[in-house]
Every structure is written in C-alpha cells, then in structure tokens.
Amino acid sequence: MTDKKYFKQVKPFRVPTTDGKLIEEHLGLATTRTPAYSIAHMIAPPHWSEPHQQPEFDEITIVIRGRKMAEVDGEEIILQAGETLLVKSGARVKYSNPFDEETEYWSVCVPAFDINTVNREDE
C-alpha cells in the first residue's frame, strides 16, 4: 500500500484452488499485506464442501446469491441471499454448498485470513 489515505483495488488476487471454488482476495495478507482484516469475493459451485476448521479469526459471510450452509459447533445454519453470519474465532466450522446452484458471497476475516491460523482438519 502507499502513503495515501485510501487504496483502490483494481486487480484482486485469485487464490489457486482445486475444488472449483472462485476466491478473489481484495484486501488482506495476499494482496496488501494487511494483517488486521481481509475481504474476499467467492463463488462456490454446486455440491462444494471444505473440511472442518477452527480458525483463530472472526469470519463474516454475506450471501449475495444462492444459499450456503455452515455447520458451527455441530449446528447447521443455512444462509440465503441477503443474509449475514458471524462465526467467532475458535468455533469449529464447516462451510459447504450442498445445493444445486452456485453460491456467491463475500467473506470478511478479522484478523486477516491466514492459512496458518485457519486450522483445517484432515478429512
């Protein structure tokens, strides 16, 4: 980032994935070396899932289109377009899209998403 009091992101970092999910980090460790927060735009394909994790950061999910499931400490929560979920640091969570349509959403992590602090389980 520069000495300016603003930053305009024109080319988010596309995170390489092998599961068909689109992840574009707009602000965070990968793009701006910002450790305090990260924000990413994501599109999860139908029937997508990731392993359980117990992150050391809060994560806010804002669903734009479709539906998304979050299993938080054993409780299943279904989010629809226009809904928001806050999962607090230390919760055991698994995100998925078990539905037949794509899910588009934004994710905000505080502090920033870090592969070393997401604590994904082997499944």
Residue map of PLM features:
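A short, N-terminal "cap"/entry segment at the start of jelly-roll beta-barrel domains
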Residues: M1-A36, R120-E123
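Ligand-binding loop in jelly-roll beta-barrel domains
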Residues: R33, S89-I115
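Histidine-centered metal-chelating micro-motifs
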Residues: W48-E50, M69, L85, S89-Y95
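Structural motif
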Residues: R67-M69, E76, R92, E102
